[in-house]
Amino acid sequence: MPETVHVVVQYGGRDLAGVIRGDESWSAAAKRLAATMSGEPAALDLSGTDKRFVVDPDLRVGLRSMTRGDLPDVARWRAADHVNRWWSDDGSPDLATVTEKYGPHIDGTTPTRMWVVEANGRSVGFVQDYRLSDYPDFALLTPDPEAIGVDYAIGEEAWVGKGLGSRMLWAWLLRTRHRFPDAATFFAAPDHRNLASLRVLEKVGFTQGTWFDEPQSDGSSATVVGCTLDVRRVLG
């Protein structure tokens, strides 16, 4: 007999609980429970036995396509200690280097796409994504070369530790599910020391897998943790 999976939607200080029906995804079950609420459920913590979602009309988190006009913000975010520690392999965070690195992604001349995260209309961070198979050397290190890879950063330090990480990744998941309807899995590979990032991934439904060494631009390697999300199970 299949294990019963419980879903809880938090809204306005109260919890609404139910169970997943048959082949229903976790997201679909949350939407069903939240049908009468004023807002869409977002993942709060999907790492436990109960899959917990939240409806918070006061926090609107979304993504928009990055433009070259965003690059000064990206350079400022990249220069912040809490970001640069994990993004140093992308080069110096000065504007010229950032423009050289990300400009082609913005222009659409590479397989990578860039997104700006907005919280209540304010730009607060960025996300980049790509199909792993478009970068064969990296894809060989991963369990599913056709997965969609993602990297992300909260740029504004004031938003760190406020629950934005899971909200921005959830917004990315929903958008990417429609952009890549054939993708069975999504993939992220944070540095093994980046415990905050690993925890955020768990909260939105990723599971940790193989540790592997990712070559860096300076000839060294970084030990990362491959994290995979089952699109059908989590999003439907």
Locate the predicted segments by residue.
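Residue-level detector of short, conserved catalytic/binding motifs and their immediate flanks
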Residues: V61, R113-W115, I148
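Residues that form generic nucleotide/phosphate-binding pockets
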Residues: T36, W77, W86, K101-H105
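Acyl-donor (CoA/ACP) binding surface of acyl/acetyltransferases
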Residues: M1-E3, V9-R14, V19-G22, W26-L59, ...
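Hydrophobic alpha-helical core bundles mediating ligand binding, dimerization, or RNAP-core interactions
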Residues: V74-R78, V98, Y102, V150, ...
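Residue-level detector of secondary-structure transition/capping positions
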Residues: A34-M37, H82, G91, I106
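Active-site rim helix/loop that mediates acceptor-substrate recognition in acyltransferases
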Residues: G91-M114, A119
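Helix-loop element at the rim of GNAT/NAT acetyltransferase active sites that forms part
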Residues: R76-P93
